[in-house]
């Protein structure tokens, strides 16, 4: 009986909304007879359009949340540990080999790419290509190369950086240097000039270009130590700048000694 009353209450509430809405349009129609009917239809269309926009925004937000969660699950898999045997009681994903992890991750990213639009689709394609390097290196490099032209700026930058790292790993140092230099010039929020120049300096060092490498490393650290915020206070030294300092100290101690001192409170 209680269920019936609740159901009936919902029906009555719905009927009141319907009657009120229809009654409003009826009264408005009486006031706008003749040519006013066109205005009425126009108003009805505007209200309908507004409702559709509201519905789309809510649906889009739900889809975005859903897509982010799906992408997050796939990323968690791709970061899973490679262990000889699973840890008892652990809920974190683990795999017996890098190949198994890559295959599982690719399958999960493919689901995201098939179900959602950009940026989630392009981001998934990037992760697929990056994981593919473990299974089929040449195919993965081909996919990353294609993604360097992605319309999603973050994906284009990440793909170019991953491609540069692959070339560096394969000892294709000239190709890697070109990509790192291009990324440094772009200075995107995803791959900053500081990060790209740090990698470029390491490539120069491998190529025996000690001066070029030292110049880049010096400039990274020098700029970081001199950087100030809007309050004119020194900014914390970035991880890339700290690593650049360590590399410079090993590569050219004399040049390292020429750097301005680091702010004591930020030396950490």
Task: Write out the residue ranges for each language-model feature.
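Acidic, polar-rich low-complexity tracts and alpha-helical solenoid repeat scaffolds
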Residues: 1-268
């Amino acid at each position: 009986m209680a269920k019936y009353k609740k159901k009936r209450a919902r029906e009555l509430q719905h009927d009141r909304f319907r009657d009120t809405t229809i009654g409003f349009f009826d009264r408005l129609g009486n006031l706008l007879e003749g040519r006013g009917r066109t205005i009425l239809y126009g108003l009805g269309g505007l209200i309908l359009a507004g409702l559709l926009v509201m519905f789309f925004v809510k649906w889009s937000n739900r889809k975005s949340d859903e897509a982010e969660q799906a992408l997050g699950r796939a990323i968690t898999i791709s970061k899973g540990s490679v262990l000889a045997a699973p840890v008892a009681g652990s809920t974190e994903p683990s795999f017996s080999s890098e190949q198994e992890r890559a295959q599982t991750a690719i399958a999960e990213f493919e689901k995201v790419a098939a179900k959602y639009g950009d940026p989630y689709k392009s981001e998934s394609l990037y992760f697929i290509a990056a994981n593919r390097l473990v299974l089929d290196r040449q195919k993965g490099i081909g996919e990353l190369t294609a993604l360097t032209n992605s319309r999603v700026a973050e994906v284009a930058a990440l793909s170019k950086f991953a491609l540069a790292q692959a070339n560096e790993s394969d000892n294709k140092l000239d190709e890697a240097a070109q990509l790192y230099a291009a990324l440094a010039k772009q200075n995107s929020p995803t791959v900053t000039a500081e990060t790209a120049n740090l990698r470029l300096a390491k490539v120069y060092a491998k190529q025996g270009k000690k001066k070029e490498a030292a110049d880049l490393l010096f400039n990274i650290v020098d700029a970081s130590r001199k950087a100030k915020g809007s309050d004119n206070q020194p900014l914390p030294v970035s991880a890339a700048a700290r690593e650049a300092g360590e590399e410079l100290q090993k590569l050219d101690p004399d040049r390292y000694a020429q750097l301005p001192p680091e702010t004591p409170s930020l030396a950490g």
